[in-house]
Every structure is written in structure tokens, then in C-alpha cells.
Amino acid sequence: MDRLFLDANVLFSAAYRSSAGLLRFWNLKNVILCSSHYALEEARINLSDDAQRGRLARLARKIQLFESTARQMPAGISLPEKDRPILLAAMDARTTHLITGDLRHFGPYFGKTIEGILIVTPSQYLKTHQPR
């Protein structure tokens, strides 16, 4: 069973409109959805209206939330300060995948495994995993 850590941009995009393609993550079988309060709050503050925030709150009820501990970044990994809590929380949640659309900061790590976590875009994961 895959444990998927959803980055803030995935949460934001899923909540942005009621027909968002990323809602497919909530219909996948044999997965556990994970994220962090940090990512959830980042998504929430970037959503512009109450309907979007309401969708985000409903989606969040089906996600296990984790926080990063004060551990160090893995050797050789360079991320901006604001993105470090995402990877660290994914590590603490013992996820199998970090799902992110952040090409700028996580792009160099796409397709690579860090501390047992495969970094992929939403489309990369969904290509090989079908909803129920």
C-alpha cells in the first residue's frame, strides 16, 4: 500500500475547483493520503474564496496529517527553507511518495528516491495508478 505525501500545491489545486483532476487522488484504492499542517495552511492561505477553503477542509478530513521534527536534511539535498518542512514531514510520515508540482525546488529530485521516498509529480503518479 502506497503512502502518499501531498504537497501544498497539490492540496491547493485539488481544492481550487470542484472538478479538479487532482481529486482523483482521493479516489485511489490501496493508498493512504498524508500531508502536514504546514502544507495544509499554505494551501489554505492561497485559496481565494470560502467555497475553495470549504473543499480543502473536506479533503483534509481524509488525510493523515504529520509535522516535521527537528531532524536534519538528508546529505546532498538542497531545498529552500520553506520547502524543507515538506520533505521532513514526508520522512516522518514514512511515506512512499512525495507528490508535488513544485518544479522549481523539487525538480532536480523528480524520479529520485530520498530516504525511501520517491519524488514525483501528480501526473507521474496518476499515470500508473487508477482510481477505484
What kind of feature is each model-predicted range?
Residues 65-103, 107-109:
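Active-site neighborhoods of divalent-metal-dependent phosphate/nucleic-acid chemistry enzymes
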Residues 13-15, 46, 109, 128-129:
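Residues that scaffold the ATP/ADP-binding catalytic core of kinase and kinase-like folds
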Residues 77, 104-132:
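Acidic, PIN/NYN-like endoribonuclease modules and their adjacent C-terminal/linker elements
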Residues 27-77:
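PIN-domain endoribonuclease scaffold, especially VapC-family toxins
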